A protein has these predicted regions:
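Viral virion structural and adsorption modules
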Residues: 1-9, 153-160
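Solvent-exposed edge beta-strands and adjacent loop segments
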Residues: 2-85, 127-139
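Hydrophobic beta-strand residues in large extracellular and virion-surface proteins
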Residues: 15, 86-88, 111-113
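Oligomerization/assembly interface segments of phage tail-like spikes and tubes
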Residues: 73-95, 140-155
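Short acidic, glycine/tyrosine-flanked loop/strand segments centered on an H-E-D-like triad
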Residues: 85-90, 116-131
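Short, conserved charged micro-motifs
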Residues: 95-102, 157-159
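Short, acidic/charged, Gly/Pro-enriched secondary-structure junctions
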Residues: 98-122
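Mixed-charge, glycine-accented linear interaction segment located at domain edges/termini
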Residues: 123-160
């Protein structure tokens, strides 16, 4: 059985990308009773796209564009695996900066997703399951896209 959910694009205002190596969360990721995590436990974001509520992001250039998140839940004997596909379309950029690509390839990371109502949620990625993909579409209407795929054993965790 697989459940599918698209978050409404207009409700998402930003996404922070956190390198897993920079994160030291105070709770284990696979305990079902964990419904929230304190904001103070969040490290500085490596990269942000969309509106940046976290002004402490290491990479200061924000990417303006459309953000979409697709969530898929696959249920198996071993448990639930949630897959989150985050896509940002970036108009009028000649190419995605090398500093972004080199910093995110071959890395495990977690995501903080910011919503228009002021709430934020953590997507805790499982080790060795994160994928970073970028593409450049050059022409009269140049655009680029960044896609981040994260697998998790949890639904999105509320940040309080």
């Amino acid at each position: 059985m697989s459940n599918y959910q698209d978050f409404i694009t207009k409700d998402i205002v930003g996404v922070d990308v956190l390198k897993a190596s920079d994160c030291h969360f105070p709770v284990p990721f696979n305990v079902p009773a964990i419904r929230s995590i304190p904001l103070s436990a969040m490290p500085t974001a490596y990269y942000n796209f969309g509106v940046n509520p976290n002004k402490n992001a290491n990479y200061s250039d924000e990417v303006d564009g459309d953000i979409a998140i697709k969530s898929t839940n696959k249920q198996s004997v071993q448990g639930n695996i949630f897959t989150y596909d985050v896509t940002a379309t970036i108009p009028s950029v000649s190419s995605i900066p090398d500093s972004i690509e080199s910093g995110l390839y071959h890395q495990d990371f977690h995501l903080i997703i910011y919503f228009a109502d002021g709430t934020s949620k953590l997507c805790y990625g499982l080790p060795n399951t994160t994928i970073f993909t970028s593409s450049d579409n050059l022409g009269s209407n140049s655009s680029n896209s960044i896609k981040i795929t994260v697998q998790s054993m949890n639904k999105l965790i509320d940040i309080i």
